[in-house]
A protein has these predicted regions:
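Conserved protein kinase catalytic/activation segment
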Residues: 144-156
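Catalytic-loop of the protein kinase fold
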Residues: 131-147
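Conserved catalytic-loop aspartate of Hanks-type protein kinases
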Residues: 195
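ATP-binding glycine-rich loop module of kinase domains
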Residues: 30-67
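Conserved HxN/HPN-centered segment at the entrance to the catalytic loop
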Residues: 73-82
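Activation segment signature within eukaryotic-like protein kinase domains
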Residues: 119-120
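Conserved short submotifs of the Hanks-type protein kinase catalytic core
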Residues: 87-101, 105
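Conserved activation segment of eukaryotic-like protein kinases, specifically the C-terminal portion
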Residues: 169-183
Length: 247
């Protein structure tokens, strides 16, 4: 069964992109569509021999983030195995994270401060790795966090970008309303502190079910959330290491 890739594909010239396509067609079979949007199609695949599940992202985007993720290994980030780009299209073969999203879990019940702190520290470690190679996730939210047993795994890097050394604002506005930092709306170039803002909203939602502008978590956690979500990035924690220390 051949894969139905989005976009026009030119197989006339050998390339890494066409090689990856052929590899996927030969060695994997599609199980189901996990997510489909105008610019992205995400499939669950099964390896024909091992039976192991993988995720295939067929989307528009920059391969640089996923290429960098191929070089790291962390229980809090998905493994990335293949990356190929052609004419603005991107194919990414990555680890399938089996578990429930933080969003679906929070629909059932909120977290104790202790459990929220444990998850928050794991997210700090995932962000520390991303920020370490100059990446900004830009879409940290409960839907993009999967709980695999006791591990919180940060997924979906389609909105991510490599921080530029120059420039005053982002060229593309991406992120999720309510979780995106103010600077993601074109006010200035985003850096790692944009993820700290989103992190603060997620932490507050884990504890209260609400955005901090509606109801702020109590006590020490509330003070952390308040600093994370300051409108001025200079007033937030400067990096996730300082944030983890506060937790």
């Amino acid at each position: 069964m051949a894969f139905n890739y989005s976009g026009d594909q030119d197989r006339s010239e050998p390339s890494l992109f066409s090689y990856v396509q052929q590899h996927l067609d030969r060695d994997f079979s599609p199980v189901r569509v996990l997510k489909e949007e105008s610019e992205a199609r995400i499939l669950l695949l099964r390896h024909s021999i091992s039976g192991q599940f993988f995720v295939l992202r067929d989307c528009a985007g920059n391969p640089e983030i996923y290429q960098k993720l191929m070089t790291v290994s962390s229980p809090f980030l998905p493994g990335v195995y293949e990356v190929a780009a052609q004419d603005g299209r991107l194919l990414v073969l990555e680890e399938y994270i089996q578990g429930d999203t933080l969003y679906s879990i929070l629909e059932q019940s909120l977290f104790s401060p202790g459990k929220a702190r444990r998850i928050a520290l794991q997210l700090c470690e995932a962000l520390r790795i991303l920020h370490g190679f100059g990446a900004v996730h830009r879409d940290v939210k409960p839907e993009n966090i999967i709980l695999r047993g006791s591990e919180a795994v940060l997924i979906d890097f389609d909105a991510s970008r490599i921080q530029k050394s120059s420039g005053t604002s982002d060229t593309v506005v991406l992120g999720t309303t309510g979780y995106a930092a103010p600077e993601q709306y074109g006010l200035s170039q985003t850096d790692s502190r944009a993820d700290i803002y989103s992190f603060g909203v997620v932490l507050n939602v884990m504890l209260t079910g609400d955005h901090p502008s509606v109801r702020l978590a109590k006590g020490h956690m509330g003070r952390i959330v308040r600093r994370c979500t300051m409108t001025n990035p200079d007033q937030r924690y400067p990096n996730v290491l300082r944030l983890a220390e506060a937790l």
